[in-house]
Design a protein with these regions (language model features):
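Conserved catalytic loop/helix region of short-chain dehydrogenase/reductase
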Residues: 1-2
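Active-site His/Glu-centered metal-binding helix of metallohydrolases
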Residues: 11
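Catalytic tyrosine of NAD(P)H-dependent dehydrogenase/reductases that use a Tyr as the general acid/base
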Residues: 5
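Active-site helix of classical SDR
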Residues: 8
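Strand-loop microenvironment adjacent to phosphate/nucleotide-handling motifs in alpha/beta enzyme folds
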Residues: 14-229
Length: 229
């Protein structure tokens, strides 16, 4: 994982793997849920309603599922998944990967507007009122320099065991219960210590993540997508 969200999901899987020794556990990994609360696409809806410019990276590609599809995947995992099975959608890189800037264009076209691409956030803000009145929408698309972004979405690693034949549209990761019990306990102790002290910062949490996940590839830039425009 390259960001805190991905790392937290990986840590959750490790704890569930430990629980799988005493009860049946199945899981799901899936792409971004389109227009879910707090997402960049949810921000498109909010900005459109307020007649504000759209801002999005043009070099990040993502897979997207509808809320219904993501719910169905979780339900199928619960009903059909075996112990320690992790279900994920079979998606084609050529057919399903799309950039946020492409989604912004499709979103605006759907609402009857053309994209007017600006060279800066200030330009987009300054031209918003005049452009929108002519059915054009100011957008600022940029190359990524924000924390925790990855070029493409990945559902599994080269070290994981896959079953790609059981279902037509769903793949399955069939991992063994691989976890370090001592490190999991140390992680919990670290979290408990922070809570007891009633004071912590992001760096404290990141340090605990690195101790449990040596492969964690987080790079802090101090910039975040939700701060854009």
């Amino acid at each position: 994982p390259v960001n805190m969200m991905g790392a937290s999901k990986r840590i959750m899987e490790m704890f569930l793997m430990r629980e799988s020794l005493t009860q049946t556990i199945s899981m799901a990994r899936f792409a971004n849920v389109a227009f879910s609360d707090g997402s960049l696409l949810h921000g498109f809806n909010q900005r459109f309603a307020k007649q504000q410019p759209l801002s999005a990276p043009n070099d990040i590609r993502r897979y997207f599922l509808t809320p219904r599809e993501s719910g169905e995947l979780c339900l199928l995992s619960g009903l059909l998944g075996g112990n320690r099975d992790i279900l994920f959608p079979k998606l084609s890189e050529k057919l399903h990967l799309i950039t946020f800037s492409e989604i912004a264009q499709k979103f605006l076209n759907y609402h009857g507007y053309e994209v007017f691409e600006c060279n800066s956030e200030d330009e987009a803000r300054g031209k918003a009122k005049k452009l929108i009145s002519t059915k054009k929408w100011p957008c600022y698309f940029f190359s990524t320099d924000t924390t925790g972004e990855k070029d493409i979405e990945e559902f599994y690693t080269n070290d994981e065991i896959l079953d790609m034949t059981r279902f037509d549209a769903i793949g399955i990761i069939c991992n063994q219960p691989n976890f370090d019990e001592i490190k999991l306990d140390e992680f919990l102790d670290g979290i408990d210590s922070l809570r007891s002290n009633k004071s912590w910062n992001k760096g404290d949490i990141i340090s605990l993540y690195f101790e449990l996940l040596p492969e964690f590839a987080h790079i802090e830039t101090g910039k975040y997508l939700d701060q854009r425009m």
